[in-house]
Amino acid sequence: MASSEEVVAPSNEEEVTETPAAQKREERLRKFRELHFKRNEARKLNHQEVVEEDKRLKLPSNWEAKKARLEYELLVDQKKKECAERGEDYDRVKLLEISAEDAERWERKKKKRNPDPGFSGYAEAQLRQYQRLTKQIKPDMENYEKQKEECGEDFHPTSNSLIYGTHVPSKDSINRMVDDVEKQIEKRAKYSRRRAYNDDADIDYINERNAKFNKKAERFYGKYTAEIKQNLERGTAV
């Protein structure tokens, strides 16, 4: 009886063999949980990236450049207001902040980007006026952000959007447009007078149309024909 009631205690060897197995199982479970967590995180990040890419694709192709230009113009307007409050000239303050080389490089870049070829036709003159007027338009970033919040995802319309044609300009915008148009009319009235005739100028034309043609030809080819004209005047032309 005594031998049957004896409880057999586990040996130390069995404990030693079970403990590493449990540790390995726990290690595998821990790695599995880490992989599961990383997979969920990767899924979330991929979804966020897909959403952001879809938003970027819906934006205009030159949106980043426009945004940078608007931010720069907004910063320039703020500096101009600060200079006006201090009674300073913004152009002079700006020149004091940059070196002579940068100013010269900026001036060359400005002339290269917007050269003045002179009058070559009414269509070209009208196009240059349009470009000059559109560059003078100042963005209203406060109203822009307000409309962006109100419209949400429809702020950048697609083929399925119904937001087109629903915008109503404010009274301030209409007043600015009226003031700008009046300034254009006033400026146009000053330059619409017929130029006075110069009696001392050389007559190398037969009528007014031919005079305009000669001026245009001189503007484009004058530097190439200057030497020939001088030789003809001196009588040394071959």
Curated annotation (Swiss-Prot):
It is found in: Nucleus. GO terms for cellular component: catalytic step 2 spliceosome; nucleus; post-mRNA release spliceosomal complex; Prp19 complex; U2-type catalytic step 2 spliceosome. Its main location: nucleus. GO terms for biological process: mRNA splicing, via spliceosome. Keywords: Coiled coil, mRNA processing, mRNA splicing, Nucleus, Spliceosome. InterPro entries: mRNA_splic_SYF2. Belongs to the SYF2 family. Identified in the spliceosome C complex. PANTHER family: GCIP-INTERACTING PROTEIN P29, PRE-MRNA-SPLICING FACTOR SYF2. Involved in pre-mRNA splicing as component of the spliceosome. This is Pre-mRNA-splicing factor syf2. It comes from Danio rerio. The gene is syf2.
